[in-house]
C-alpha cells in the first residue's frame, strides 16, 4: 500500500514536499462548517458577538458539540475550558446545570406547548415581583432585544411621547438603531462605529437622544430641550456610577413625569439577587431582564409599576412562543439554585480575584493595563498600539493550551480556584511574549492568521 511504498522508496515522495496543501487542509470541522455557513447565512451566524472574526479569524473552532460546567467541546472532539464569555453571559450556574436541565426535561416530557397557558408564567411573575418589591406587574418574552423593545412600547404608550433619552446598548430593534438616522456617528460610543441604520424608517429620526454615562448634565440638557417620555439606560457596565448619578437620573425622571427603564439584561443577578439597581438603592419604573435568568434557556422579562405596565392593554404586544413552557420553568429553577448557592456572591468574588491577578501579571512584565467591568463581567485592555494583535495572540496561544480566552471573563460558579490557577499558569507565558514584543519582537511573526476584529464600543 501507500505507506509501505513510502517506507521502501521515500525518494518517490520527495517531489511532494514543495507542494503547498490546499487552503483549508488544516481546518477543523468547525472552520469548514463556518465557510459553508457564510454562503448560506448573512453574516455567517445569528449573533455578531459569536462570529469567529471577533475571536480568531480562520482558526476559531466556531461550533460546539457539547457544553458542561465551564467546559466546551468542539466538533472535532477537542475539550476547552471557557474563560471567555460563557455563552455571552447566559450561564451563571455553568453550562448544563443538572437541576435546571432536569426541570426542563420534566416539562418537555409533560408537554411544552398547548392551547392552554402554562402556569409557570404566573409563578415566575410572582417570583420576580417578590425579588423586586417596587414592581407590580410582569410581561415575559424570550430574548433581551425583544424585551427591551416591549419596554419601550409600553413606556411610550403610558406617556404618549415618542422621544427617548438613552445610554448604553439595548439591542437591534428599529427604536434603538434610529439614533443613527441622519448622523451615523450617534451610536459610536454605544455600538460599532459607523453603523448604518439601513432598513430603519426615516421618520424615526430624532426620537432617540444619547447621553454619556455619569454625565448628568447631558441628560439635564436633553430633558430641558426635548419632550422626553422615556429614559432608558444600563445601571452600570464598565464603570461605577458616580455619587448621586443614579439618584439624579431618578429625580429627573420623577420631576418630569418620565418613565425610567433600567436595562438589566446583562447586569441582572451578577452582583445582587436581582437587578443591579438594588445595590444602589435606586428603583426604576421598569426593568428588563434576560441572559442569566434562564441559565442558557431562552427567557426574558419586563417588570414595572402598575401605572406604567397597564398601558400594555392600550397597545398590542403578543407572540405565540412567549407562551411556551421551557423558558419560565428554567428561570424558576435557576432562581431557586441562585438563591440557595448565593451565586452572585461567588462570581463577584471570583471576578475580583481574576482582575487582581491580571494586574499582578501586567506588573510582572511591566505592561500597562486597564481593568474594568462588573466583577463578574471583568475585562482588561493593554493600551498600546498593537493591542488588537496582542488580543489575537492571547486567544491563539490559549486555544492551543485548551482555553477559550480573550480579554473578558464572564464568570460562572463552575470557575473554581483550580481552573483559575491553571488559566493564569498558561496566561503568564503569553504576557511574557507580549512584553517581548513591546521590547522589539515582531508580533506579526507570531500570529498564525488574521487579526481579530474590534468589539463593541459604548458610552458607558
Annotated model-derived regions:
Residues 123-230:
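PLP-dependent aspartate aminotransferase-fold enzymes
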Amino acid at each position: 500500500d501507500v505507506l509501505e511504498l513510502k517506507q521502501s522508496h521515500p525518494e518517490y515522495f520527495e517531489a511532494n514536499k514543495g507542494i503547498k496543501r490546499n487552503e483549508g487542509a488544516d481546518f477543523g470541522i468547525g472552520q469548514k462548517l463556518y465557510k459553508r455557513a457564510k454562503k448560506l447565512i448573512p453574516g455567517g451566524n445569528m449573533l455578531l458577538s459569536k462570529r469567529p472574526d471577533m475571536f480568531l479569524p480562520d482558526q476559531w473552532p466556531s461550533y460546539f458539540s457539547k457544553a458542561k460546567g465551564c467546559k466546551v467541546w468542539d466538533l472535532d472532539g477537542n475539550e476547552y475550558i471557557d474563560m471567555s464569555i460563557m455563552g455571552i453571559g447566559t450561564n451563571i450556574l455553568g453550562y448544563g446545570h443538572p437541576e435546571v436541565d432536569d426541570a426542563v426535561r420534566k416539562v418537555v416530557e409533560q408537554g411544552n406547548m398547548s392551547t392552554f397557558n402554562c402556569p409557570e408564567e404566573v409563578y415566575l411573575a410572582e417570583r420576580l415581583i417578590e425579588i423586586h418589591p417596587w414592581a407590580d406587574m410582569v410581561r415575559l418574552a424570550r430574548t433581551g432585544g425583544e424585551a427591551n423593545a416591549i419596554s419601550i412600547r409600553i413606556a411610550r404608550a403610558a406617556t404618549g411621547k415618542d422621544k427617548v433619552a438613552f445610554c448604553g446598548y439595548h439591542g437591534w430593534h428599529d427604536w434603538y438603531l434610529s439614533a443613527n438616522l441622519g448622523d451615523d456617528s450617534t451610536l459610536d460610543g454605544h455600538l460599532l462605529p459607523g453603523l448604518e441604520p439601513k432598513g430603519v424608517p426615516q421618520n424615526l429620526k430624532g426620537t432617540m437622544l444619547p447621553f454619556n454615562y455619569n454625565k448628568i448634565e447631558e441628560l439635564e440638557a436633553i430633558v430641558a430641550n426635548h419632550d422626553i417620555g422615556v429614559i432608558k439606560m444600563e445601571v452600570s457596565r464598565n464603570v461605577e456610577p458616580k455619587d448621586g448619578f443614579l439618584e439624579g437620573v431618578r429625580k429627573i425622571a420623577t420631576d418630569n413625569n418620565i418613565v425610567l427603564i433600567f436595562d438589566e439584561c446583562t447586569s441582572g443577578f451578577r452582583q445582587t439577587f436581582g437587578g443591579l439597581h438594588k445595590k444602589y438603592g435606586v428603583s426604576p419604573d421598569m426593568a428588563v431582564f434576560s441572559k442569566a435568568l434562564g441559565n442558557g434557556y431562552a427567557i426574558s422579562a419586563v417588570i414595572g409599576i402598575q401605572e406604567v405596565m397597564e398601558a400594555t392593554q392600550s397597545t398590542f404586544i403578543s407572540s405565540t412562543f412567549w407562551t411556551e413552557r421551557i423558558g419560565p420553568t428554567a428561570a424558576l429553577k435557576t432562581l431557586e439554585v441562585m438563591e440557595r448557592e448565593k451565586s452572585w456572591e461567588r462570581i463577584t468574588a471570583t471576578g475580583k480575584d481574576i482582575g487582581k491577578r491580571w494586574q499582578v501579571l501586567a506588573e510582572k512584565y511591566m505592561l500597562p493595563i486597564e481593568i474594568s467591568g462588573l466583577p463578574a463581567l471583568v475585562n482588561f485592555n493593554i493600551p498600546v498600539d498593537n493591542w488588537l494583535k496582542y488580543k489575537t495572540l492571547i486567544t491563539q496561544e490559549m486555544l492551543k493550551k485548551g482555553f477559550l480566552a480573550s480579554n473578558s471573563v464572564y464568570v460562572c460558579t463552575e470557575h473554581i480556584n483550580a481552573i483559575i490557577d491553571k488559566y493564569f499558569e498558561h496566561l503568564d507565558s503569553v504576557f511574557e511574549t507580549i512584553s517581548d514584543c513591546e521590547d522589539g519582537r515582531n508580533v506579526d511573526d507570531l500570529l498564525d492568521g488574521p487579526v481579530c476584529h474590534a468589539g463593541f464600543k459604548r458610552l458607558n
